Amino acid sequence: MPPKSHKCSRKEGEVEEPLLTENPDRYVIFPIKYPDIWQKYKEAESSIWTVEEIDLGNDMTDWEKLDDGERHFIKHVLAFFAASDGIVLENLAERFMCEVQVPEVRCFYGFQIAMENIHSETYSVLIDTYVVDPDEKQRLLHAIRTIPCIEKKAKWAIEWIGSQTSFPTRLVAFAAVEGIFFSGSFCAIFWLKKRGLMPGLTFSNELISRDEGLHTDFACLLYEKYIVNKLPRDRVLEIICNAVSIEREFICDALPVRLIGMNSQLMTQYIEFVADRLLVSLGYDRHYNSKNPFDFMDMISLQGKTNFFEKKVGEYQKAGVMSSERSSKVFSLDADF
């Protein structure tokens, strides 16, 4: 008799979530019952990369040209990222993988865990490469305990791992973590790319932001199409607006983006735009009605009208894996809401 899976409690009167319904066939993949979910897994599988494929050879020349404020900003962005992927990974391993009973979803989550490891390793390598002083290096690598503004973001995400709230609530919360908490930092690093700086850092950012876009897109697919007990709009707004407030405080006030020559007001507008995009993808109306103020973000690998998986940015897609018909539903930056 196989062991029972971890069950997620539900409120009285709620219908059991199909994704969480006990499934004795959860150990076997075929036959595929959720082709759109399986498609997302194949998209993720086709895009695997490793840290060894990132060339940091020219970055140190640019690093030395940056002023102290620019270096401070980049170091603290990397410090947040170095731990954040581990937080997402722990939630997947401890909660979502135990709760969800659909093999296709588990395949995606299993692959996402592998990619979060690669992301975390990449950020650790970047810190190890750029930061020479060993004490500062350790402070940055342990930023969720040593740097208050990073600790605040991490604490918000970690609390959701142990939360007794419903699966749909936590699904929205971690969509906010990956869709909003990373947005300002991704945007700031793409700003450096626009300036022609740090090619290794900016290319790794392109790959990681593409992956995180897919992860967020996947969470939205599960929620919008398969979650039965959807949250009231007010509850979703509470989660999303809280995440926006924390991200705005982090990227605009604590670091802040003016250190690299970016406008804080425009960055706030961009974060609100990203939040609206997330709300729409979850099936709700926009809240902020903010426009994307950064034209250079229209072409990044979170993707606009050209699907990354068609474009093959940097040729990081395994040949043949995505040769079948591809899904056109993409978590896009430039959708007309």
Swiss-Prot record:
Family annotation (InterPro entries): Ferritin-like_SF, RNR-like, RNR_small, RNR_small_AS, RNR_small_fam
Name the Enzyme Commission number(s) assigned to this protein: 1.17.4.1
Could you name the active-site residues? Answer: 123
GO molecular function, a single term: ribonucleoside-diphosphate reductase activity, thioredoxin disulfide as acceptor
Cite a single Pfam family from the UniProt record: Ribonuc_red_sm
Query: In terms of domain of life, where is this protein from?
Result: Eukaryota
Query: What PROSITE patterns does the record point to?
Result: RIBORED_SMALL (PS00368)
Catalyzed reactions per annotation? a 2'-deoxyribonucleoside 5'-diphosphate + [thioredoxin]-disulfide + H2O = a ribonucleoside 5'-diphosphate + [thioredoxin]-dithiol
Q: Which UniProt keywords apply?
A: Deoxyribonucleotide synthesis, Iron, Metal-binding, Oxidoreductase
What cofactor(s) does the depicted protein rely on?
Answer: Fe cation
UniProt record, GO biological process: deoxyribonucleotide biosynthetic process
The cofactor binding remark recorded in the entry reads: Binds 2 iron ions per subunit.
Annotated binding of Fe cation 1, by residue: 85, 116, 119
| UniProt: Fe cation 2 binding residues | 116, 178, 212, 215
Q: Report the function annotation for this chain.
A: Provides the precursors necessary for DNA synthesis. Catalyzes the biosynthesis of deoxyribonucleotides from the corresponding ribonucleotides.
The record describes its quaternary structure and partners as: Heterodimer of a large and a small subunit.
Similarity annotation: Belongs to the ribonucleoside diphosphate reductase small chain family.
UniProt-recorded name of the protein:
Ribonucleoside-diphosphate reductase small chain
Species the sequence originates in: Trypanosoma brucei brucei
